[in-house]
């Protein structure tokens, strides 16, 4: 197995879980790790929120043993708040601290953070420098190709990140204005890799083991990061590990196996957030696991009414029975 070294943190060169706000929570990250993700990144936390002692913001930074190696991610555009937030984040003992300079969402960029930092290279450099000076662990940055098609400046921004002390740079191959539409431009990732000496993490449109290897080969990147391609498919990380090592990988789980995996995921959510909140938050991931099953729409509706793990267990058994009946009909 090959490894990538990020500021002294040794990471297997397979696939990492990308940071995804309101998606990649602790349960999601643990699922990814259990299925072979080499590295995970937490949900982004506001630097100002941390400095103002916001409890919910601080909760985003906690790290459990089953998630390591893990980066916590911060966003902000004021160096003094970034410095303070890094000092607070280090109390949670993350392996890496990541600075979000790629989020395209309006509520983030309207405040000058996220991908808006790519429009202000000097400020971006000051933010990264403030984080690096305050940190005792490696600092990485996550960027996009640029703001729009007329301002593709990922290479310039990556160079500034390196000069400012960043240990690695992750590049999503879309612009801010693309959001998540269209195709990720892997040429931008390759150009960044050819322009800096720190590790480059490629991100965008990796949804199969074959595409993961293709990104490695085409861009020359040091690590591949998977985001939306893992929705309801934590086993993708295992398949990627298998494919990179042997050239083949295990088949997709059966309907029954997917339901067992869904149960595990929802149990983790409930363990982390309690049954009342956890069962509500489980509706979204449940819909991903049920996708493609016969009667999926009906079962999604039924999942939205669940309030306890016992109810979930009964529903899973019911779905398994119906999937089994359909499988027998197909024979």
Where are the regions that the model predicts?
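Flavin-dependent oxidoreductase catalytic cores
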Residues: 1-331
């Amino acid at each position: 197995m090959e490894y990538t070294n990020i500021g002294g943190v040794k990471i297997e060169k397979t696939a990492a879980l990308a940071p995804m706000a309101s998606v990649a929570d602790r349960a999601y990250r643990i699922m990814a790790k259990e299925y072979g993700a080499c590295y995970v990144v937490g949900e982004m936390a506001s630097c100002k929120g941390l400095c103002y002692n916001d409890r919910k913001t601080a909760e985003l930074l906690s790290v459990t043993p089953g998630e390591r190696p893990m980066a916590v991610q911060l966003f902000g555009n004021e160096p003094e708040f970034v410095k303070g937030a890094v000092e607070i984040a280090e109390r949670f003992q993350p392996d890496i601290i990541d600075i979000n300079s790629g989020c395209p969402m309006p509520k983030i960029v309207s405040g000058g953070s996220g991908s808006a930092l790519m429009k202000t290279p000097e400020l971006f450099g000051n933010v990264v420098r403030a984080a690096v000076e305050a940190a005792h662990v490696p600092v990485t940055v996550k960027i996009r190709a640029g703001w729009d098609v007329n301002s593709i400046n990922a290479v310039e921004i990556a160079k500034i990140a390196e000069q400012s002390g960043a240990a690695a740079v992750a590049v999503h191959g879309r612009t801010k204005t693309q959001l998540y539409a269209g195709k990720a431009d892997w040429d931008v990732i390759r150009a960044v890799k050819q322009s800096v000496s720190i590790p480059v993490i490629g991100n965008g449109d990796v949804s199969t083991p074959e595409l993961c290897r293709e990104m490695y080969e085409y861009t020359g990147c040091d690590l591949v990061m998977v985001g939306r391609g893992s929705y309801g498919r934590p086993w993708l990380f295992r398949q990627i590990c298998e494919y990179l090592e042997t050239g083949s990988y295990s088949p997709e789980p059966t309907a029954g196996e997917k339901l067992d995996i869904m149960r595990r995921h929802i149990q983790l959510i409930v363990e982390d957030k309690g049954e009342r909140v956890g069962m509500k938050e489980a509706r979204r991931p449940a819909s991903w696991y049920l996708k493609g099953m016969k009667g999926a729409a009906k079962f999604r509706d039924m999942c939205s009414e669940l309030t306890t793990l016992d109810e979930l267990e009964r529903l899973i058994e019911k779905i398994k029975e119906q999937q089994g009946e359909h499988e027998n009909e197909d024979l």
